[in-house]
Amino acid sequence: MMNSRDSITRRELLQRLALLTGATLVPWRAFGALEPAPSDKLGPVLPLRPLGKTGLKVTMLAVGGSHIGRPPESEAQAVIEAAIANGIRTFDTAELYQNGGSEERYGKFLTPKYREHVLIFTKTMAEDAATARNHLEGSLRRMKTDYIDLWQLHDVRMMDKADVRVHGVLDVMLKAKAEGKVRHIGFTGHASWKTHAHVLELTDAFETCLMPINVADPSYESFTLNVLPILLQRNMGAMAMKTLAADGLMGGRGGTGPRIIPDRLSVHEALRYVWSLPVSTLVSGMASVAHLKANVASARSFIAMSEADRQALVAKVADVAQSGEMERGFKGQTGS
């Protein structure tokens, strides 16, 4: 595995990307990155992708729940309704978001009408069994459902905490799965690929992983180069977040950093790059209907990039991305 803090040349970066695509994307191509867009009782559905070994099929675009809990309730309801109307059937959230507020909005606007048609994912920040069980029961209650499709260990950051959290919570997750309260289990994090790799060394029980994947990632502390191959080897569902580097590609939240978008590439190109990798879904925080519709348009017009085009896009931003500045808002944030 590479140490992304080491300075690497453009040629070395492209060689590493070529090794990734050559060694790990063959199985992905074999079972197909996309299925034809289906329809259900609610209307046309976005193209589906398999979620690793879970047997679930997820829409290539998923709603990120943190943004559902932020705006006024009427706007959150509008985003949920627009997501359904535009073919999204995969919804992610977490017990942490707005202290359960995001889950409550799913329970108010999503599950009463659409539960049988959607997949709902949530997460727990628990470090011990009792807290994990309380979080699970609270999530089920707030979302007004008797099962969760994917329950995830949320935001695993520090290496030593990873041991504590996995050993403290995994048995509860497995028991909840046996009880039918959750269908599948996974873990998430965005601070350190090394911690992700450590979690994967601790256990093979997790079925999915949600992590940062974006055009800047291969150049700095890369999840794509260091974790994605392991997920593919284990047939785990790889899910992408921070696909615009938490706005880091657009100068950051304050707009003072380097602007990759729109100076060097478009939002559509950035999303297309991610979808061209072997990810099951792209989880996006979409706080407005307009934002959601723009992302849906990119999904519906998606044509996979060639290996050469992916490498060219990474190389196009590598000189800025190698410093890590664009991703500093989440990578390396390993505090408890």
Report the location of each language-model feature.
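N-terminal secretory signal peptides and thylakoid transit peptides that target proteins
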Residues: 2-21
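C-terminal segment of N-terminal export signals and the immediately downstream linker at the start
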Residues: 28-61, 68-69
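Acidic (Asp/Glu)-rich catalytic clusters
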Residues: 52-55, 107-115, 139-145, 200-204
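Active-site mouth loops of central-metabolism enzymes
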Residues: 64-74, 122-130, 255-262
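Glycine-rich, proline-tolerant flexible connector loops at the mouths of alpha/beta enzymes
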Residues: 92-109
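Glycine/proline-rich, positively charged
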Residues: 127-239, 290
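Structured C-terminal cap/extension of enzyme domains
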Residues: 202, 224-336
